[in-house]
Regions:
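Conserved residues at the C-terminal ends of beta-strands
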Residues: 6, 37, 100, 119, ...
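ALDH superfamily catalytic-core signature
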Residues: 82, 109, 115, 123-200
């Protein structure tokens, strides 16, 4: 939905100039090829989020899924191929390359790929960001976080315990938005920790 909404907003801007009889305007142009490196968790969602935005902006995508989820990549690519064929879209709008980290390195170093979007660990993001920056490319990095929940003395503890527990262990904790720590008001600390321990 966000990508479809964005498609109606890619019209550029026209501005007045301080020079009489002149106007300034900006235009949006496709980058060309977007490289997508996704992690093992949420492989389909991450691919969809990235490709939808790239396609709306007129770009084509090369997707390198995690070596732990290659079949997700193959399945998505097959579904996309059917959709593209049914709608008379040319081949090559979406490409798939499976392999280990060396395949990702090729994407980060290839100057024909102006933008690389990578989802994964902070360590991986640091490597990808530096390699892409060294060739003056652009990178979008969604990396592992250290997310906190702040629990005030006025918090609804029933909802807080459910949210904290699900945030920490939902999907086995294998997501970048997992709750890693709680910041609890002193006056309710004992009550919250006791309820949380019992919830486990």
């Amino acid at each position: 939905d966000f990508a479809v909404g964005l498609s109606r907003q890619l019209h550029g801007l026209t501005m007045h100039s301080e020079r009489p009889g002149h106007r300034m305007y900006e235009q949006y142009h496709p980058l060309g090829v977007v490289g997508i490196i996704s992690a093992f968790n949420f492989p389909v969602a991450v691919w969809c989020w990235n490709t939808a935005l790239a396609w709306i902006c007129g770009d084509v995508c090369i997707w390198k899924p995690s070596e732990k989820t290659p079949l997700c990549g193959v399945a998505c690519q097959n579904i996309w191929a059917e959709v593209a064929k049914e709608n008379d879209l040319p081949e090559g709008i979406s490409c798939l390359v499976n392999g280990d980290f060396t395949v990702g390195e090729f994407l980060t170093q290839d100057e024909r790929i102006p933008l690389v979007s990578a989802t994964g660990s902070t360590r991986m993001g640091r490597i990808v960001g530096q390699k892409v920056a060294s060739r003056f490319g652009k990178s979008l990095l969604e990396l592992g976080g250290n997310n906190a929940i702040i629990v005030s003395d006025k918090a609804d503890l029933k909802i807080t315990i459910i949210g904290a527990l699900f945030g920490a262990v939902g999907t086995c904790g294998q997501r970048c938005t997992s709750t890693r720590r709680l910041i609890i008001h002193d006056s309710i600390y004992e009550e919250v920790t006791s309820k949380l321990a019992n919830a486990y």
